[in-house]
């Protein structure tokens, strides 16, 4: 594994990088795997992403770019399986991964990089069989999530906790998005600190770009045209939430905050919810019902998840992007919003403390009390000068994140795991 020669087996059992983020189980991890793979390929690596087939129409292999293949592995029925059902399909999935390597020259892959604990379980077997290092990214951790559950949310099962502990014990290297995540690995899972490496995710600065700065020729017309194209009012503040509609992501906090603002007679922004139900099929309907219950149905626009380029357009046209998650290992959407020059209001949890610089690129809210969120939104949306200052800071913060840097640092982790 010297020079540019590197072959990576990337494992993502429960969600494919080809799926639309913001729907089902697809989210920031999908973007992470896709963008990391692209950056690794630009550095000369070959990446093969193994994921579970969820449709008979999916071909065995999809080439998604130079040096990047997605391999669909049949493991269980294509439809009807919840993520919690997938541990029972890991044997079939692992067998499919091993068969792929068995058809090639021995020693084809240099490293296994697994994502999420399900993939880590399969990765342990593959890395052992191929005698290559296992590098693992948790993305989320059951013990962390269970420590910050929303009322009514279901805790992660003990089987997941045990599975995560096994992966942490066996992995040659663990990649954490932030120092806080690294600390969680050591504190909650007794990870060996010498095997934990902090590598920040990046952001696609070619897709997520700002509008022309205020005062530039045609800037006002461009902004108005962008809003008009999305059907947004030109003279109303807009707050965007982009993500899966589930209790963990806490869009209900925003809806309740709008209800509080309405009760106080405040001028309400338009809240745009971009995303579909995840976990519970009724999650979106329940959020719509909540908006009706608190009297803000006409002030919340529910739309399905959109492509990356369309998401950038929504971010550019928003006055604020809100990320009220109860637990977040990083919060990629927050950095993408800032790359568009849009300040972020986020919960003061986990990786969001790294993704958002409080007072410089956005505001971190210390809890999930709708009254506190209402106060923060009210104060920000009334202060155009402050929004403009935070917008400038958002661009500065986002400029420090790069997928090429992420790939470079990840390759170093691969190298260290190989020689350990």
Curated annotation (Swiss-Prot):
Which Gene3D superfamilies is this protein grouped with?
Glycogen Phosphorylase B
> Which residues participate in UDP-N-acetyl-alpha-D-glucosamine binding?
20-21, 28, 244, 249, 306, 328, 336
Recorded hits in CDD domains, A to Z, give: GT4_sucrose_synthase
Gene Ontology biological process: mycothiol biosynthetic process
| Residues bound to 1D-myo-inositol 3-phosphate | 14, 25-30, 83, 116, 140, 160
Superkingdom of this protein's organism? Bacteria
Q: Which Pfam families match?
A: Glyco_trans_4_4, Glycos_transf_1
Reaction catalysis annotation: 1D-myo-inositol 3-phosphate + UDP-N-acetyl-alpha-D-glucosamine = 1D-myo-inositol 2-acetamido-2-deoxy-alpha-D-glucopyranoside 3-phosphate + UDP + H(+)
- Identify the EC number(s): 2.4.1.250
For Mg(2+), which residues are the binding ones?
A: 315-316, 318, 342
- GO terms, molecular function: acetylglucosaminyltransferase activity; D-inositol-3-phosphate glycosyltransferase activity; magnesium ion binding
Q: Keyword annotations for this protein?
A: Glycosyltransferase, Magnesium, Metal-binding, Transferase
**Which top EC class is named for this enzyme in its record?**
transferase
UniProt record similarity statement: Belongs to the glycosyltransferase group 1 family. MshA subfamily.
According to its UniProt entry, the function of this protein is described as: Catalyzes the transfer of a N-acetyl-glucosamine moiety to 1D-myo-inositol 3-phosphate to produce 1D-myo-inositol 2-acetamido-2-deoxy-glucopyranoside 3-phosphate in the mycothiol biosynthesis pathway.
Complex formation = Homodimer.
What name goes with this protein? Answer: D-inositol 3-phosphate glycosyltransferase
The record lists the organism as: Sanguibacter keddieii (strain ATCC 51767 / DSM 10542 / NCFB 3025 / ST-74)
């Amino acid at each position: 594994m010297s020079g540019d020669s590197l072959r990576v087996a990337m494992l993502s059992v429960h969600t494919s990088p080809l799926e639309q983020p913001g729907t089902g189980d697809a989210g920031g991890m999908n973007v992470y795997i896709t963008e990391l793979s692209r950056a690794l390929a630009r550095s000369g690596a070959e990446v093969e992403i193994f994921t579970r087939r969820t449709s008979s129409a999916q071909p065995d292999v999809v080439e998604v770019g130079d040096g990047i293949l997605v391999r669909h592995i049949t493991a269980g029925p294509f439809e009807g399986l919840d993520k919690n059902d997938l541990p029972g399909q890991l044997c079939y999935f692992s067998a499919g991964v091993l068969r792929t390597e068995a058809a090639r020259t021995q020693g084809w892959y240099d490293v296994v990089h697994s994502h999420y604990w399900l993939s880590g379980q399969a990765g342990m077997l593959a890395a052992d069989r191929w005698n290559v290092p296992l590098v693992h990214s948790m993305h989320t951790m059951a013990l962390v999530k269970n420590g910050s559950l929303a009322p009514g949310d279901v805790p992660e099962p003990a089987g997941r906790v045990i599975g995560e502990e096994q992966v942490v014990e066996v992995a040659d290297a663990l990649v954490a998005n932030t120092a806080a995540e690294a600390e969680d690995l050591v504190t909650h899972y007794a990870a060996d600190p010498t095997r934990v490496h902090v590598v920040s995710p990046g952001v696609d600065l070619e897709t997520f770009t700002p509008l022309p700065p205020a005062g530039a020729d045609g800037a006002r017309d461009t902004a108005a045209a962008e809003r008009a194209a999305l059907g947004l009012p030109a003279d109303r503040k807009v707050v965007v939430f982009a993500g899966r509609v589930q209790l963990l992501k806490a869009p209900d906090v925003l809806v309740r905050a709008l209800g509080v603002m309405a009760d106080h007679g405040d001028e309400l922004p338009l809240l745009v919810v971009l995303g579909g139900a995840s976990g519970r099929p009724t999650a979106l309907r329940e959020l719509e019902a909540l908006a009706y219950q608190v009297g803000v149905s006409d002030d919340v626009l529910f739309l399905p998840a959109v492509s990356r380029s369309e998401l950038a357009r929504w971010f550019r046209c928003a006055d604020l992007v809100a990320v009220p998650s109860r637990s977040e290992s990083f919060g990629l959407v927050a950095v993408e919003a800032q790359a568009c020059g849009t300040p972020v209001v986020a919960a003061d949890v986990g990786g969001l403390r790294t993704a958002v610089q409080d007072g410089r690129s956005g505001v971190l809210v210390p809890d999930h009390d709708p009254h506190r969120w209402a106060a923060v939104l009210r104060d920000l949306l009334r202060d155009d000068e402050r929004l403009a200052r935070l917008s400038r800071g958002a661009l500065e913060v986002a400029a420090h994140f790069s997928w090429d840097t992420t790939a470079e640092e990840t390759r170093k982790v691969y190298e260290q795991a190989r020689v350990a």
